[in-house]
């Protein structure tokens, strides 16, 4: 089994865990927690939230 990455925070998702969300255009989003899913549905961007791995990776040198 392979680990997947969260579409919102880029965190790792264990096999058999997490949630999948299919948008109207057919693209699939995978979330590691309900926190990520709720923030996505509220229209927030993972790059702007300090607790996400995406933010930490982009602002590593600062």
Swiss-Prot record:
**A Pfam match:** Ribosomal_L24e
Q: Which GO terms describe its molecular function?
A: rRNA binding; structural constituent of ribosome; zinc ion binding
* Gene3D superfamilies named among the record's database cross-references: Ribosomal protein L24e
Which residues form the C4-type zinc fingers? Answer: 6-36
Record's GO cellular component, any one? ribonucleoprotein complex
**Necessary cofactors:** Zn(2+)
Q: Where is Zn(2+) annotated to bind?
A: 6, 9, 32, 36
Q: Which GO terms describe its biological process?
A: translation
Q: Which CDD domains match?
A: Ribosomal_L24e_L24
The UniProt keywords, alphabetically, are: Metal-binding, Ribonucleoprotein, Ribosomal protein, RNA-binding, rRNA-binding, Zinc, Zinc-finger
Q: Which residues form a coiled coil?
A: none
The cofactor note reads: Binds 1 zinc ion per subunit.
Give the superkingdom in one word: Archaea
Against InterPro entries, the record matches this protein to: L24e/L24_sf, Ribosomal_eL24, Ribosomal_eL24-rel_arc, Ribosomal_eL24-rel_N, Ribosomal_eL24_CS, TRASH_dom
Report the function annotation for this chain: Binds to the 23S rRNA.
UniProt subunit comment: Part of the 50S ribosomal subunit. Forms a cluster with proteins L3 and L14.
The Swiss-Prot or TrEMBL record describes its family as follows: Belongs to the eukaryotic ribosomal protein eL24 family.
Q: What is this protein called?
A: Large ribosomal subunit protein eL24
UniProt lineage: Archaea, Methanobacteriati, Methanobacteriota, Methanomada group, Methanococci
Q: Encoded by which gene?
A: rpl24e
